[in-house]
């Protein structure tokens, strides 16, 4: 199991950042590897809300497991999904800046030695996606790694 975290500082108020980040249908706007995310449950966003995610090479269903408005949102894949992952965003207000701690637990199904080798690449790719999130929220537009331009 890979475990890592990244931190990014976004020059926007916490409420604005949390609203965008906790709506997981926004992920394709800042993560080029995720093609689509759809909310499956009809309830308002909160603990228990489920989503279906389509990435370039696979698909997963996941559920919100922790939700504290303007502070924390965490998700975990449902049992039938692979790869298995848990992700937690923790936000704190620092004036008009919002630091986001992005914590991951990712089951790769690979031996520990191989996990260590790919771990740095995965962490780096996630960090790069977070810089795209920062740019999108601060500038209102971003060009993703695959050349797609997104505006909000």
Where are these regions (language model features)?
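Hydrophobic/aromatic beta-strand elements that line small-molecule binding cavities or substrate pockets
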Residues: 6-8, 60-66, 77, 85-93
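Beta-strand/loop substructures that line and gate deep hydrophobic ligand-binding cavities in soluble
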Residues: 79-128, 133-135, 144-147
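Hydrophobic ligand-binding cavity/cleft-lining segments
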Residues: 1-41, 132, 138-139, 151-152
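Eukaryotic helix-grip
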Residues: 67-74, 131
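Short beta-strand segments that buttress and anchor functional surface loops
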Residues: 49-56, 73-80
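A short, structured loop/turn motif at beta-sheet edges
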Residues: 14, 42, 65-70, 90-99
């Amino acid at each position: 199991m890979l475990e890592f975290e990244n931190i990014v500082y976004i020059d926007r108020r916490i409420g604005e950042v949390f609203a965008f980040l906790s709506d997981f249908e926004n992920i394709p706007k800042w993560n080029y590897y995720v093609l689509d995310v759809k909310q499956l449950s009809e309830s308002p966003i909160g603990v228990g809300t489920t989503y279906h995610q389509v990435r370039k090479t696979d698909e997963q269903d996941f559920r919100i497991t922790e939700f504290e408005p303007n502070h924390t949102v965490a998700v975990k894949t449902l049992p039938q999904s692979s790869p298995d992952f848990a992700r937690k965003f923790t936000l704190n207000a620092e004036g008009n800046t919002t630091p986001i701690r992005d914590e991951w637990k990712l089951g790769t199904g690979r031996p520990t030695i191989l996990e260590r080798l790919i771990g740095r690449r995965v962490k780096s790719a996630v960090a790069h996606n977070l810089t795209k999130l920062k740019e999108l929220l601060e500038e209102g537009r971003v060009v993703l790694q695959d050349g797609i331009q997104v505006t909000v």
